Amino acid sequence: MEQAIIAGGCFWCTEAVFRDVIGVSEVESGYIGGSVADPTYKQVCTGSTGHAEGIRVTYDPDVISISEIYDVFLGTHDPTQLNRQGNDIGTQYRSAIFPLNAAQGEEAKAAIERWNKDNGKVAVTTIEGLTGDAQTAPWYPAEDYHQEYWDGEGQRNPYCLAVIPPKIMKLRKSFQKYVKS
């Protein structure tokens, strides 16, 4: 099993999408890319910590590649929006990839270039924290109530009901071969 860390707006949304992707065994919501150790959701929401709301995906590379993970990521949120996704505004909602090694860094660059070419637009997705062959930004798991949010509280949350189903539909329409049956 391997891992990937990505940030594409509210982690509830990104987590919900990747829970439906083949080869993915675990999705953990959390914070990465900031300057405060062990940040809380309340702190991150102020935008002052520098963290992004992200997800750490554990996946089987024999089922889905890192390249395909990045393609699904870029294709299920709007990577052209700087420091926001829809009504969620702030650096904590930026579109970013946090490669865990140099190979993932190269795949991230290639995925962004592919997305730009295929869509005729320019993604503002950043590649962050990679120094040499290591990710230097610490990962901090989000509070327990954020984990598997869509599967529980999210089904009753008006924000989630408005934002998550269109992302899941985009996954099912544009990335059908990567959807769990």
Q: What is each stretch, according to the model?
A:
Residues 1-181:
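Flexible coil/turn and secondary-structure edge motifs
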